[in-house]
Amino acid sequence: MLKKLLSCCITSALCFHSSLAFSQPNEIADSAELQQAPDTLPATLMLAPDDIAIADRYIVVFQQPQMMASSSPEFEQFTQQSVDRMSGLYSIQVESVFDHSISGFVANLSPEQLKDLRSDPRVDYIEQDRILSLDPIVSADANQTNAIWGLDRIDQRNLPLDNNYSANFDGTGVTAYVIDTGVNNAHVEFGGRSVSGYDFVDNDADASDCNGHGTHVAGTIGGSLYGVAKNVNLVGVRVLSCSGSGSTSGVIAGVDWVAANASGPSVANMSLGGGQSVALDSAVQSAVQSGVSFMLAAGNSNADACNYSPARVATGVTVGSTTSTDARSSFSNWGSCVDVFAPGSQIKSAWYDGGYKTISGTSMATPHVAGVAALYLQENSSVSPSQVEALIVSRASTGKVTDTRGSVNKLLYSLTDADCGQDCGGPDPTPDPEGKLTSGVPVSGLSGSSGQVAYYYVDVEAGQRLTVQMYGGSGDADLYLRFGAKPTLNAWDCRPFKYGNNETCTVSATQSGRYHVMIQGYSNYSGVSIQANY
């Protein structure tokens, strides 16, 4: 089940000078087909670096049955039953439970309990919890000229700036979730459109900001003066304290809350990140699968973003930062995991005390993209997260950023294709043509990019045993199967969701009709084959 490996520290994606801050329920197959064979090796244990490790506290993640969507009631029931059984069996005092984005819990464990859990075949992996901290907030010149240059830049293809910002939409009917230090809902920038979701620091319903970072991010997404989507609804999800500190488990809890509570067209902003974390990556990936578009800060280490979480999550939109001259910000991470660049240096926005502040970081670039995602979701509220990503990338301006360090050269653009003249950066991608699968006949040589989907179908009679197998090649593709309609990221009957391309869906007794198959690129893939047998 692990889609990625390793685990390191997490920091905020805020940077100043050289410092870092940086459906309906799915049908369940016969239980015998869902059983995981007991592993002869103990579950993977990932320890945090000593300086940020939280002693004896661990995130325990369960093996998830293949044909159970994380958005289904069965997933929540499965998780709660697993927690109840394990806590009783091993005398564990559970601190919190994750039952929407990932299936697991957080608890303080003795060495004996840790050993017992690692030997339990129901456990997928265990990750030590760790401290997450923001570096001290440092302001730039609050009186700088052309303070809203970021907005000015994203509505035009080329420099120089024209000192105006225009958009085809304003985010009406869309909700943006800010997973951060909270939001000052009373700030004049928000005009009553901002509410608290949940506070995972104080464990209450008041996600007010006493740090500033979250309010600044929210202001760039949807502030009336400094925001991209000026009528979007904002929901603060507080996972970091007044001092900017928190934990990986707290951030996962925030992601889990969004996956459980988001409804309608939604986007989530995560202007935080750091070293690799399997649990955090899995939570974000699953939340995207539930239908929420996630915008992720690339990070501020001037390094390869693929080495950071959640920046490396392929189904999110990973954002690098630029300056007002269209250069990559010196602090911005880079590489193949970056999907788009956006203004991030010297960005003015709302502050927790009711005022305003100018700060820098991929933390500031990311909410520009979240705002544009809200505009595109208002344009078409039925688009999936992968389609939102495709729109952002295909509409972005090409070849404008200098010193990309091997990243895609795409600069965020807020308007629609109809307004971009001859410089649209290419047409929207179209899905691969749908094709019929014949029993025993493989379709080979399949390839695709991250987020790209391809559709196939199988027509069967009632009572047959159907197996759809994907295999071979390189990269990482995911297999989806659904009866009667094409699968989506949050509506399917089977989704093995394993690392690599070797995945199988089995239906013991088919219904009469058409089963639809979808292959989605978790990352770029090639040389893959698919075959149905019935």
UniProtKB/Swiss-Prot annotation:
Highest rank taxon of the organism: Bacteria
Catalytic residues in the record? 180 (charge relay system), 213 (charge relay system), 363 (charge relay system)
Enzymatic class: hydrolase
Question: Which molecular-function annotation in GO is an example for this chain?
Answer: serine-type endopeptidase activity
Q: Which residue numbers delimit the Inhibitor I9 domain? A: 57-134
Q: Which PROSITE patterns does the record associate with it?
A: SUBTILASE, SUBTILASE_ASP, SUBTILASE_HIS, SUBTILASE_SER
Q: Where is this region: Disordered?
A: 423-442
Q: What range does the record give for the signal peptide?
A: 1-21
Q: Give the UniProt record's GO annotations in the biological process aspect.
A: proteolysis
A Pfam family found in this protein is PPC
The family database entries (InterPro entries) matched by this protein are listed as:
PCSK9_ProteinaseK-like, Peptidase_C_arc/bac, Peptidase_S8/S53_dom, Peptidase_S8/S53_dom_sf, Peptidase_S8_Asp-AS, Peptidase_S8_His-AS, Peptidase_S8_Ser-AS, Peptidase_S8_subtilisin-like
Provide the Peptidase S8 domain boundaries.
148-419
Keyword Hydrolase on entry: yes
Q: Which residues form the propeptide?
A: 22-141
Q: Which UniProt keywords apply?
A: Hydrolase, Protease, Serine protease, Signal, Zymogen
Output a single Gene Ontology CC term carried by this record: extracellular space
EC number assigned by the record: 3.4.21.-
Read off the PANTHER family from this record. Answer: CEREVISIN-RELATED (PTHR43806:SF11), PEPTIDASE S8 (PTHR43806)
- Family (UniProt): Belongs to the peptidase S8 family.
Name the UniProt record assigns to this protein: Alkaline serine exoprotease A
Q: Which organism is it from?
A: Vibrio alginolyticus
